[in-house]
From Swiss-Prot:
The keyword Protease does not apply. The lineage of its organism: Bacteria, Bacillati, Bacillota, Bacilli, Bacillales. It is found in: Cytoplasm. The keyword Transmembrane helix does not apply. GO terms for cellular component: cytoplasm. This is Putative universal stress protein SERP1273. InterPro entries: Rossmann-like_a/b/a_fold, Universal_stress_UspA, UspA. It comes from Staphylococcus epidermidis (strain ATCC 35984 / DSM 28319 / BCRC 17069 / CCUG 31568 / BM 3577 / RP62A). Keywords: Cytoplasm. It comes from the Bacteria.
């Protein structure tokens, strides 16, 4: 039987990512695996600003740090023994499969499905698709069709998002 020992889960604050995170916690527990929770702040967001908005960057960073701290606490409380977090800046499509997966020695990357609509996916593609195409290890993309309509995130709550909105 194949078992995974080093699982990387990508989170972005969306409901889909938290649903995938919950499943990653279950997989990590069943396999007694290391769980690395990653968030990549897409620095391309800032390229459209003529003047670099340091306040916006700081808000994004603080949101991500709080998000990762919350997810680590949930995973630890659920019984995952070895939990780590990573915060990176850059393109999630490149950093997750090409850098982070190798840096942490992941043998499984888990990700939620994209929140993009069909047109956006056609134009820019999804992070999940990029991970599948470029990962050096197995990838599990968690589908959200089975996510209950009343699913309420524990970490990426509306209150947390409101705290860091402009």
């Amino acid at each position: 039987m194949i078992s995974y020992k080093n699982i990387l889960i990508a989170v972005d604050g969306s409901h889909e990512a938290e649903w995938a995170f919950n499943k990653a916690v279950g997989v990590a527990k069943r396999n007694d695996a290391q769980l690395t929770i990653v968030n990549v702040i897409d620095s391309r967001t800032y390229s459209s600003y003529e003047v670099y908005d340091a306040q916006f960057t700081e808000k994004s960073k603080h949101f991500s740090e709080e998000l990762l701290k919350g997810y680590k606490e949930v995973a630890t409380n659920a019984g995952v023994k070895n939990v780590d977090t990573r915060l990176e800046f850059g393109s999630p499509k490149a950093i997750i499969p090409k850098k982070l997966a190798r840096d942490v020695g992941a043998d499984l990357i888990m990700s939620g499905t994209s929140g993009l609509n069909a047109v956006e996916r056609f134009i820019v593609g999804s992070v999940s698709e990029a991970i599948v195409r470029h990962a050096p290890c197995d990838v599990l993309v968690v589908r959200t069709e089975e996510m209950p309509e009343d699913f309420q995130p524990q970490v990426a709550t509306p209150q947390l998002r409101e705290k860091y909105q402009d």
